[in-house]
Every structure is written in C-alpha cells, then in structure tokens.
C-alpha cells in the first residue's frame, strides 16, 4: 500500500511539473506574440530610396512581397529608420552635453552657486539668507534617489535581457550548424555505402552517386561557410555582449555615484558623474536604437494567421516558411531539393526488383525430363524446377512469395544403364540421351535451396543463389533507403528543426530582446533625469550654500 502511494505521489508530481512546463511555454509564446503584434503595427517609412520623399512602407516582410521580388534596399531602410529618432536623440544629447559643459561656467548657470538663471551673477551669501533651502535640496535628493532605484531595476532587467539575447543567438547558430553537419555526415555515409561493389550492376547507381556527390559538395561548402558565419556571429555577439555589459555597469556606477553624492553631500562627485553621462546617455540610446529594429524584422518573419483568422505562431501559416519550404505542409512529403534523388532511387529499386524478377521468371521456365518412378523405360515428362504460382506476376510486393513460399524440385542424375542414382561411370555423361534424372527432392523454398537445401543439381543451386544474392542486394538497398535516406529527405525531418528554430527566434529571442530594448530606453531616460539632478546637485549638494536656519521648502 505504501509503495502504491509513493508511485501515485510521483505520478502526481510529474503531472504537475509537466503542466507547469506547458503553462510556462504557452505563457512565453503568448508574451512573444503580444510583442510581435506590437512591433508589427508600428509604421515604417522610407526616404533615401524614394527620391527624398518620406513615404510609408507597406507592412509585412519586404512590404508583403515574395522573397524573389523583394526590394531589399527599401526594406532595410524602412527598418533602420525605425531608430532614426532615437539616433537623433543620441546625437543631440551628445552634442548638447559637450556644449553645455564647455560653456557651463560662462552661460549655463555657472560653476558656483550664484544669482542669475543662465549667465552667472554674484555668488550666494548664506549668511544673509541667500542660497538653497533645505526643503528644496531634500526634494532634489529624494527625486535623485528614486531615479537611482529605478536605474537599479532596469539595470538588472537589461543584464538579463542581454544575457538571454546572447544565449539565443549562440543557440540558434549551434542549432543550424549542428543540423547541417549531421545531415552532411549522413549523406557521406549513404554515399560510401552506395560505393560498395554489389550496387555497381544497377544503371541508375552512377546517376544517384553523382547527385549525392553534388549534394555533399554543396553541403560541405555550406558547412564551411556556416562554420565561418557561426564563428563570426558568436565573436561579434560576444563583443556586443561585453560592450553592453561594460556600458551598463558604467551607467549604473555613475548613477550610484550621483545617488551617493546626494546622500552624503559630494557636489564634485555629482559634477564628475554628470559629465560622464554626456557619453553614457547617448550610449544607451544607441544600444536601444541598434536592437529596436530587430524585433520589427522578427515580427515580419514570425507573425502569421491560421485558417480561422486568429493570430498565432505556427509553421505553414507563415508566408516565408511556406515559400521557402513549399510542399512540406504534409510531414510525409519529400523536401523539394531531394525530389530528383527520390525519383532516381525509386527507379534504382525498381530496376533491382525487375532484375530479380527476370531471374525468377527464367527459373520458372527451367524444366528437365522426369522419369516416373525413376524408370528409364518410362516416358518422361517435363518437370519445372520451380512451382511458380500461375496467377501471380513477380513484383516488389510478390517477390517474397517466389523466394520463400515456392517449392524447388532438386534432382540427381545417372546413366540410364546404371543400377544406382548418381552413377555416371557406365556411360558418357556428355551424351544427354544416355543419362536421366533421378531421386527428385522437394525443397521448401528458393531461399532454402540456396542455403544448402539443394544438394544435387548444381545448375539449380547456382540459379537460386543468384536470385537470393540479387534479393539480398535489393533488401540492403531498400533498408539503406528506408533507414538512412528517407529520414533525411522527408519533411518530417525538417519540421522539428523549423519548430526549434522558430521557438528560438520567435519566442526566446523576441522575449529576450524586449527585456533589453525597453529597459535601455527607460535607462536612458532615467540617466537623463539623473544628469539634470546631478547638474543641480553639483551646487545644491554642497552644504555651504544652503540658507542658514531655513525651514521652508
């Protein structure tokens, strides 16, 4: 009873884990679809490729055109210009920041606490009630610390998003490369097996080998380029990751310094940190600008509609996948690039079957004189060596019946005047009229005969061995085709790979990019706010310039 309870408890736990996994997976897909829909609805425009006129670009991948008809320059521009505004913000922030700090002491409020808004006037004299009130300084510190807290949150989120994006890109690269390498290894193994001597007798073999050689050559070239692309992509991705991590850390350190300067009153630290933000704020806008268009492209690639019109992530409701992998809606279909190979192999199998059947048909016609009761004085009749089914035609479906269910009639020979069967000493065996068949034996099948069941007539033995040898070649060829080739060329081999890639690109990467894109924009805004409070704090955080005895805000 205790054992049963343990088993039931284990099953319940496994069921809960599976349900949780399915829920998390569905939740991730739902979030990704929401993000994709959000990006899909964003308007895109072209300018440079439309003769200097700002024109709205049609929605969808390549504006809804097929890949062959895509105007890539317009599509790429429309995607890049999505970040045009934020690039401009980054440039303006950088230029204004540099100008601001160059002329800070002259016309942007001055470097010391003074009267005047832009142009600095006389210095504040706290002894006569001039300076910054404690209440206003407190509010400034509070706002600063709130923004620093916000920076901590978006810093953590950005790091997580950046790490997930890196893992996703590396995972995608490995998935594609591993699939290519595995397929190539299988094709090479198939080609090596086809090079065996036993297959050389078939007419189509050379043509099949030629196609396989071409596929392998293309595959090796693709693998080589893919390895380079994969390596370069990982290198660039790792560089991107490190740059972003370093930038995020610097931004967080600077934000923290402004927070510390607010807490303990370090105006010089506040000023230095604010100067550093001249570089860091544009950096964050650039990070945002670089990644923002990516999800727009991903949205074009991944968005789809099912037959009910409900938006979903799926395979062949996706127009790009449908176009690239046309004909693979059914798992049992053959991938288009392998259709010619399949046709050749089918012809080869049919050729092998026909050759085997020709041998069998010849054997079915083979007959020898048989003397009733082995009496040389009796009138002989023609006895077929094989009891071939009269109503069957040899084919790939009936071949096994001929080989494993057809009786073979084996026999010995002797001189007609000899007393015992097998005695050829009393006549000239080359004179057929002086010899006769004897001791006829029924052997259960052609296969049994070829394996030693037939012991007398060497012609019958050789014929059955030839037939079974052809059948063995046909069987090994069929096994090679079924076990090695078919799994590679059928859509059932491709679709799980598409599902895996789609899950990486359309779910994992979309969610990861969103964790990086949105927080970097918020981070840039918060840093801008901290830059302002840091500039204000470069004076107000100095306790010497507060109104003495001030209680008001």
Swiss-Prot record:
<feature type="glycosylation site" description="N-linked (GlcNAc...) asparagine">
    <location>
        <position position="171"/>
    </location>
</feature>
<feature type="transmembrane region" description="Helical">
    <location>
        <begin position="137"/>
        <end position="157"/>
    </location>
</feature>
<feature type="glycosylation site" description="N-linked (GlcNAc...) asparagine">
    <location>
        <position position="405"/>
    </location>
</feature>
<feature type="glycosylation site" description="N-linked (GlcNAc...) asparagine">
    <location>
        <position position="178"/>
    </location>
</feature>
<feature type="glycosylation site" description="N-linked (GlcNAc...) asparagine">
    <location>
        <position position="396"/>
    </location>
</feature>
<keyword id="KW-0812">Transmembrane</keyword>
<keyword id="KW-0732">Signal</keyword>
<protein>
    <recommendedName>
        <fullName>Transmembrane protein DDB_G0292058</fullName>
    </recommendedName>
</protein>
<feature type="glycosylation site" description="N-linked (GlcNAc...) asparagine">
    <location>
        <position position="315"/>
    </location>
</feature>
<feature type="transmembrane region" description="Helical">
    <location>
        <begin position="274"/>
        <end position="294"/>
    </location>
</feature>
<dbReference type="InterPro" id="IPR040283">
    <property type="entry name" value="DDB_G0292058-like"/>
</dbReference>
<keyword id="KW-0325">Glycoprotein</keyword>
<feature type="glycosylation site" description="N-linked (GlcNAc...) asparagine">
    <location>
        <position position="351"/>
    </location>
</feature>
<keyword id="KW-0472">Membrane</keyword>
<feature type="signal peptide">
    <location>
        <begin position="1"/>
        <end position="26"/>
    </location>
</feature>
<feature type="glycosylation site" description="N-linked (GlcNAc...) asparagine">
    <location>
        <position position="462"/>
    </location>
</feature>
<feature type="transmembrane region" description="Helical">
    <location>
        <begin position="515"/>
        <end position="535"/>
    </location>
</feature>
<dbReference type="GO" id="GO:0016020">
    <property type="term" value="C:membrane"/>
</dbReference>
<feature type="transmembrane region" description="Helical">
    <location>
        <begin position="243"/>
        <end position="263"/>
    </location>
</feature>
<feature type="glycosylation site" description="N-linked (GlcNAc...) asparagine">
    <location>
        <position position="195"/>
    </location>
</feature>
<feature type="glycosylation site" description="N-linked (GlcNAc...) asparagine">
    <location>
        <position position="162"/>
    </location>
</feature>
<feature type="transmembrane region" description="Helical">
    <location>
        <begin position="80"/>
        <end position="100"/>
    </location>
</feature>
<keyword id="KW-1133">Transmembrane helix</keyword>
<feature type="glycosylation site" description="N-linked (GlcNAc...) asparagine">
    <location>
        <position position="332"/>
    </location>
</feature>
């Amino acid at each position: 009873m205790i054992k049963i309870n343990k088993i039931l408890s284990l099953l319940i736990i496994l069921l809960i884990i599976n349900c949780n996994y399915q829920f998390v997976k569905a939740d991730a897909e739902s979030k990704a679809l929401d993000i994709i829909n959000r990006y899909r609805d964003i308007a895109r425009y072209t300018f440079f490729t439309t003769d200097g006129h700002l024109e709205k670009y049609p929605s969808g991948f390549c504006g809804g055109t097929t890949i062959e008809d895509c105007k890539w320059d317009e599509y790429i521009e429309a995607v890049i210009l999505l970040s045009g505004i934020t690039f401009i913000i980054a440039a303006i922030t950088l230029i204004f920041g540099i100008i601001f700090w160059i002329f800070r002491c002259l016309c942007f409020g001055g470097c010391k606490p003074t009267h005047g808004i832009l142009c600095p006037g006389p210095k504040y004299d706290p002894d006569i009630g001039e300076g910054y009130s404690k209440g206003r300084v407190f509010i400034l510190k509070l706002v600063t610390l709130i923004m620093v807290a916000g920076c901590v949150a978006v810093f953590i989120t950005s790091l997580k998003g950046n790490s997930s994006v890196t893992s996703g890109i590396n995972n995608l690269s490995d998935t594609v490369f591993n699939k290519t390498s595995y397929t190539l290894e299988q094709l090479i193994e198939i080609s090596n097996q086809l090079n065996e001597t036993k297959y050389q007798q078939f007419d189509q073999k050379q043509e099949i080998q030629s196609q396989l050689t071409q596929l392998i050559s293309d595959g090796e070239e693709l693998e080589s380029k893919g390895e380079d692309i994969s390596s370069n992509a990982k290198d660039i991705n790792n560089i991107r990751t490190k740059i972003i991590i370093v930038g995020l850390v610097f931004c967080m350190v600077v934000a923290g310094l402004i927070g510390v300067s607010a807490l303990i009153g370090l105006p010089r630290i506040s000023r230095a940190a604010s100067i550093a933000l001249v570089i860091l704020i544009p950096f964050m806008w650039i990070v945002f600008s670089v990644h923002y268009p990516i999800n727009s492209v991903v949205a074009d690639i991944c968005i789809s509609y099912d037959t009910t019109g409900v938006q979903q992530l799926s395979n062949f409701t996706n127009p790009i996948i449908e176009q690239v992998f046309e004909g693979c809606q059914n798992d049992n279909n053959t991938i288009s690039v392998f259709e010619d190979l399949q046709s050749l192999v089918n012809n080869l199998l049919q050729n092998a079957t026909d050759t085997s059947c020709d041998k069998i048909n010849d054997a079915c016609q083979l007959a020898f004189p048989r003397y009733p009761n082995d009496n040389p004085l009796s009138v002989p009749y023609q006895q077929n060596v094989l009891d071939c089914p009269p109503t069957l035609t040899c084919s790939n479906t009936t071949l096994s019946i001929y080989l494993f269910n057809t009786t073979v009639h084996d026999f010995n020979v002797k001189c007609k005047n000899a007393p015992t069967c097998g005695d050829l000493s009393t006549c000239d065996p080359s004179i057929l009229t002086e010899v006769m068949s004897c001791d006829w034996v029924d052997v259960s099948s052609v296969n049994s005969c070829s394996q030693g069941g037939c012991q007398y007539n060497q012609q019958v033995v050789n014929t059955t061995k030839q037939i079974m040898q052809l059948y063995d070649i046909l069987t090994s060829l069929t096994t090679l085709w079924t076990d090695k080739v078919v799994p590679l060329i059928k859509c059932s081999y491709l679709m799980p790979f598409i599902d895996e890639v789609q899950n990486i690109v359309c779910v994992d990467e979309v969610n990861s990019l969103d964790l990086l894109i949105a927080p970097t924009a918020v981070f840039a805004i918060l840093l801008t706010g901290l830059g302002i409070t840091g500039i204000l704090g470069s004076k107000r955080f100095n306790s010497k310039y507060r109104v003495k005895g001030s209680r008001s805000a």
